[in-house]
Amino acid sequence: MRAALQNSSVIGPTVGFVRLPHAEGLPLPAYESTGAAGMDLRAAVPDDRPLLILPGKRSLVPTGLILEIPEGMEGQVRPRSGLAFKHGLTVLNSPGTVDSDYRGEVKVLLINLGDEDFAVTRGMRIAQIVFAVVTQAAVEERSLAGGTARGSGGFGSTGTV
């Protein structure tokens, strides 16, 4: 297993991670390569009770982590490409948003789109989290929307495939 990179070389805001009792012994999220955008989230399920997700079914998987995300940022929970490609397992509400003021346990909503049962085991890397800057927009009601060359065309109207 490749050792995760130390975060000491990362320049950016600090995100606090609180490890809950059922996540004891699991590694904290870390960047796995110098160019990685996301940190892997692991399943904090009991060793003796893997979580079985049947084809077409979904399950909320605990990570055993509470995050302290700086104001003005969010955590985006995204699928891991290998799980999606090899097993059809993906994050149902992708990207799932973890707001900066949320202080509950981060859980990952997984769905099995594959043809076989999938067992989520303790410590399995089930998703990734990407931290991003967000802004809050001011709301201004208008009677008409300003015109553009595109207009109201959508769903393939730009001619790109």
Swiss-Prot record:
Substrate binds at R80, S81, G82, N93, T97, V98, D99, K107. One of its GO terms (biological process) is dUTP catabolic process. Its EC number is 3.6.1.23. CDD domains: trimeric_dUTPase. One of its GO terms (molecular function) is dUTP diphosphatase activity. Keywords: Hydrolase, Magnesium, Metal-binding, Nucleotide metabolism. Pathway: Pyrimidine metabolism; dUMP biosynthesis; dUMP from dCTP (dUTP route): step 2/2. Belongs to the dUTPase family. This enzyme is involved in nucleotide metabolism: it produces dUMP, the immediate precursor of thymidine nucleotides and it decreases the intracellular concentration of dUTP so that uracil cannot be incorporated into DNA. This is Deoxyuridine 5'-triphosphate nucleotidohydrolase. It comes from Mesorhizobium japonicum (strain LMG 29417 / CECT 9101 / MAFF 303099). The lineage of its organism: Bacteria, Pseudomonadati, Pseudomonadota, Alphaproteobacteria, Hyphomicrobiales.
